């Protein structure tokens, strides 16, 4: 490694440790010529996953952006940050397992909504209201009705008791 102070190409590693995220290794090095110390980081050279926005722009997949959106949707809900991080991990794993390097925001959003629906319906509705960009209250109401109908026990829907889909 070339010394940033004197340009000499010989050094020795004084200390190595893994980062908190376990995605890089931090190395303290000492130049063999000037004896000054400097830090280097070693990271895996990952192939970026691109997200195709609705307007056609392409951006690198940003897990922090996804997590931030989920945290907003789950604010004041009984969902741990660990569960949300796992949800983002699953989404990233899905992207990595795929041969395709580009995914639309629509596909990623639908995947996240489906997972969020299983986790917490209120958070799902919050996320969907931003993601789906409902044009009016009726669209929002339809989504709620579909959610309520799908959550209702099958026996209540068949018998037509109060609150079921057959009462409409």
Curated annotation (Swiss-Prot):
Residues covered by the ATP-cone domain: 49-139
Superkingdom of origin: Bacteria
GO MF terms, alphabetically ordered: ATP binding; DNA binding; zinc ion binding
Keywords: ATP-binding, DNA-binding, Metal-binding, Nucleotide-binding, Repressor, Transcription, Transcription regulation, Zinc, Zinc-finger
Positions annotated as zinc finger (unnamed): 3-34
Cofactor, how bound (note): Binds 1 zinc ion.
Cofactor(s) recorded in Swiss-Prot or TrEMBL: Zn(2+)
A Pfam entry, by short name: Zn_ribbon_NrdR
GO biological process: negative regulation of DNA-templated transcription
Residues passing through the membrane, by range: none
InterPro entries with a match to the protein in the record: ATP-cone_dom, NrdR-like_N, RNR_NrdR-like
Physiological role: Negatively regulates transcription of bacterial ribonucleotide reductase nrd genes and operons by binding to NrdR-boxes.
Entry's family note: Belongs to the NrdR family.
Name of protein: Transcriptional repressor NrdR
Lineage: Bacteria, Pseudomonadati, Acidobacteriota, Terriglobia, Terriglobales
Gene that specifies this protein: nrdR
